[in-house]
Amino acid sequence: MMKRVFSISWYLIIVLLIGSCDQIFNSKDNDDTKEIFDEGRINPTLEKLDGYAPVQPFWSGFDAPEDVHIGFDEFVYVTDANGLHLLDRGDLSPRITISLDGATAVTQDRLLNVYVSARIDTIIESIDPTITWNLPAIFKIKNMNGAGPLTYVDTLIFPFDDASLSTSAAQNARLNRNSSFNYERVKITGLSILGDNTLYVTRKGPFNEITQVAAPDNTVLEFSRIRENGVLTSKMINVRQIRTLNPAIPSLRSGIGLSAISSFVASPQRDSFTDDRSFLIAQADQNVDIPFRVLWVNAVETVDGLVFQQNSSLLAQDTTQADGFLYEPNKFIKPVDIAYTADDDSYIFVIDQELNKLFQFQTNGQEGVPPPAGAEDQTRQILVSFGEFGAGPKQFNQPSGVAYFDRVVYVADKGNNRISRFKLTSDFE
């Protein structure tokens, strides 16, 4: 459907021709002003001085959106019940849609390849040629943004692309519909990219033994590009399963019912990125009491290689500086997505689906933003986290994804079938 696009400069030309002081500057109740607000300006009646204000219009027309991501190409990628959608950041051009069954998480690497987790139907002749299996998969897609012919350059299908299940016997053992460990019950829940285009994947499922050769289902997997004859190809291979995350016992280094992952690399594109392989994860399992559901896991180079350690420093909480903290026990109920801003602010956003709330933290674990100039208390962070159940401009209904770009926060508001957008009032010029 074509959209009518009005530029602010066009409105200013019109009102200048009309004359009159009120018409030149516009009032809050003026129809022109309201329409300008609808095209992306802050509505001043909706927000106090400090906090996140809705950036309208919100984007509708989705069917239970699961995730939202702003790529290095600066396009917006959204997954929902119909598959994967591409939008420009104003949602002004026709959307591009790829139909995918069960599309959930989406990310993009620095080479502009898009990765999306979904489901795939496949027949495994060695088991039974009459059975169609519905398995978790990750599709690697090139040129969805129109830079060339759209191409599926790789498809990772599980359990076959889990290096810890390296034999056909081990793989086929997980494909049994009479077993509680049947791999059709496994889900890929999160995707994130590192500076060298390595892919992090979060997975959850029923098999969580830690003494077996096979990695537990609740884990983080790492995929890198395959090198052939010294040349990197577009194909991916599983190079690591991060087994230091306990799949069943809560701690500062656990991975129970993993729902999301975020590295510390994010758009916009630049010449170089951090080589830090640390990450943030969310644990959404509702059958386990998990005091710390969002964790920062440090990747540390040692003489024995790369090890993954808990970030105990976030337990230090100065209540004279902030009222909330990332490592506050029982802070979250069902965190389902995380976003890191990778700009000068270095904010961390967490979406809690059960609380219908967007949380915002700094990298020191403190909740809130620094006080603006002129604030009476310059030592205490200002809480800007918000949300409750509903369909209003600062309400959510089962929010499931969060992204950030150029000081705008994007939320996949699943139950309201929309992408909501927000911006700090202090960031409006």
Place the predicted regions along the sequence by residue.
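A short helix->beta-strand "capping" segment at the edge of beta-propeller domains
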Residues: 28-63, 174-176, 319-321, 386
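Surface loop/turn motifs at the tips and blade-to-blade linkers of beta-strand repeat domains
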Residues: 56-61, 96-100, 157-159, 171-184, ...
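Blade-level signature of beta-propeller repeat domains, shared across WD40, Kelch, NHL, RCC1
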Residues: 396-429
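C-terminal motif of bacterial Sec signal peptides marking the signal peptidase cleavage site
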Residues: 16-20
